[in-house]
A protein has these predicted regions:
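Cytosolic juxtamembrane N-terminal segment immediately preceding the first transmembrane helix
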Residues: 1-30
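Extracytoplasmic gate region of multi-pass secondary transporters
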Residues: 33-34, 213-307, 395-399
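Extracellular/periplasmic helix-loop-helix junction of adjacent transmembrane segments
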Residues: 34-64, 293-294
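Helix-breaking motifs and short loop linkers at transmembrane-helix boundaries and internal kinks
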Residues: 45, 77, 98-104, 132, ...
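Helix-to-loop junctions at the C-terminal end of transmembrane segments
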Residues: 66-77, 310-321
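Structural signature of the two symmetry-related core transmembrane helices
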Residues: 80-94, 324-339
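Cytoplasmic helix-loop-helix junction between adjacent transmembrane helices
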Residues: 108-145
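Helix-loop-helix hairpin linking two adjacent transmembrane segments in secondary transporters
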Residues: 143-186, 204-208, 224-236
Length: 448
């Protein structure tokens, strides 16, 4: 592994570090929201479940952004699309700070999710198409831990600034790092795989991309806008409108529909795993009576564990195989649940958060390599992002469900967190065990 990393040249390191920075700062902007559920609920005089809908619409909008921006990346290149995506979601992050009502915040977070959806798939493709195959396992773990690093940064900013600047100030702070990542991408060269295939692609292959993009945006905004107009719950509208339309996107990958459907199901389980253990954990800690500093510190410790687990299992997947690395990590998470969800002291909860973070992100550390190795080469800009973000869409209602379940149990989040982690870990182990693997596949050539 170390030998393959030493063989990477400046172009390959540049693409890897840029993709990592983009995903880290994307996640930073997303996770700022989860620390502020109670503060936003208090300002707008609603319950926490109503505010969690803002995160639900963000997740539900992401696959439509992934599809649209992925198509643009397959047509115009990875690098320019990534820069546009970062500028867009930075703008909507800033606008969120000035939301006059919860309704306005819901719509802004849907726009944010649509823009954010374009980052992961395109960024991962740029990196995976640029680096040597033998470095892919470690780089996969490294890239995916950008999400944990973003969460860690959000925890630290919450710890240091929230009591001074409030939730609106937090959104303003969130803009600056994202703009820095856009500047980083200006120094990155285009994917060699895209450059090699530029002259072999059919001129009409993406001719309807802009029309499809408008449709995708309208669908992404539908749950938030229709909820405001009709009073129906956001979750109901997500599964009634976004989910069927999102799954219809499989038609664009109809030549590979079996693997696309399998990976969408797998990524639904993975997103249930990550968001089900991360998004409400700060709220859970607050419900136990811990203050801003204690919540921020415990969450930061959990994300240090996540970074360690992702790097370790990403690298080990080169020996264990992609599937077994994910299975082992999911199995470990089950053993950690009692310490993570039912401890009574901050020290034990922080230790549990470290171990759960390592287990959950250990399984996630394999995902960028696994998806890109299984993706068809002619749509690698769109395919990994689509199946990943479809998982986000299908899992998006979980956070509202967990908050509602906790409310029904007198505000105790322990049961909701524990049942989610246990059931989903078993589900992942089963899905991955019977799935395919193409470890070490050549991503620089066209697949038949």
């Amino acid at each position: 592994m170390l030998e393959s990393l030493r063989e990477m040249d400046r172009r390959q390191w540049s693409a890897t570090l840029a993709a990592f920075a983009g995903w880290s700062l994307d996640a930073f902007d997303f996770f700022l929201m989860v620390f502020m559920f109670q503060a936003i609920a208090h300002e707008f005089h609603v319950g926490v479940p109503a505010v969690t809908a803002a995160s639900a619409v963000t997740l539900a909008a992401r696959p439509f952004g992934a599809f649209f921006f992925g198509q643009l990346a397959d047509r115009y290149g990875r690098r320019p699309v990534l820069i546009v995506v970062i500028l867009l979601y930075s703008g909507f992050e800033l606008a969120s700070a000035f939301a006059p009502s919860l309704a306005a915040l819901l719509i802004l977070r849907a726009f944010f999710g649509f823009s954010m959806g374009g980052e992961w798939g395109v960024g991962a493709s740029l990196a995976m198409e640029t680096i040597p195959a033998k470095a892919r396992g470690f780089v996969s773990g490294f890239l995916q831990q950008g999400y944990a690093v973003g969460y860690l940064l959000a925890a630290l900013v919450f710890y240091l600034l929230f009591d001074k600047i409030g939730w609106r100030g937090m959104f303003i702070v969130g803009v600056a790092p994202a703009l820095i990542s856009a500047l980083i991408f200006l120094t990155v060269k285009e994917s060699p795989s895209f450059e090699a295939a530029r002259h072999t692609r059919s001129p009409g292959q993406h001719r309807h991309v802009w029309t499809l993009g408008v449709i995708a945006l309208l669908v992404a905004l539908a749950p938030s806008t229709l909820s405001i107009l009709t009073g129906l719950s956001v979750t109901t509208l997500i599964y009634a409108i976004c989910a069927p339309v999102g799954l219809a996107g499989l038609w664009f990958f109809r030549s590979h529909w079996r693997i696309a459907l399998y990976l969408a199901v797998m990524m639904t389980a993975f997103n249930l795993f990550s968001h089900g253990t991360q998004d409400l954990y700060p709220t859970f800690l607050k419900s136990r009576g811990f203050g801003t500093g204690q919540v921020g510190m415990a969450t930061a410790i959990g994300n240090v564990g996540a970074i360690c687990g992702g790097l370790m299992m990403g690298a080990w997947s080169e020996r264990l195989g992609r599937r077994w690395a994910m299975i082992v990590s999911a199995g470990v998470s089950i053993l950690v649940i009692p310490l993570w969800a039912f401890s009574h002291t901050l020290g034990l909860l922080a230790a549990g958060a470290f171990m759960m973070g390592a287990a959950v992100q250990g399984s996630w550390g394999v995902v960028p390599a696994h998806l890109n190795e299984l993706a068809p080469s002619d749509s690698r800009g769109a395919f990994p992002g689509y199946v990943y973000q479809m998982g986000n869409l299908l899992a998006s209602g979980l956070i509202v469900g967990q908050a509602t379940l906790a409310k029904a149990h007198g505000g105790d989040y322990s049961f909701a967190l524990a049942i989610t982690a246990g059931v989903v870990a078993v589900l992942i182990m089963v899905i991955v065990l019977f799935g395919p693997e193409r470890r070490g596949a050549d991503l620089t050539v066209e697949q038949e």
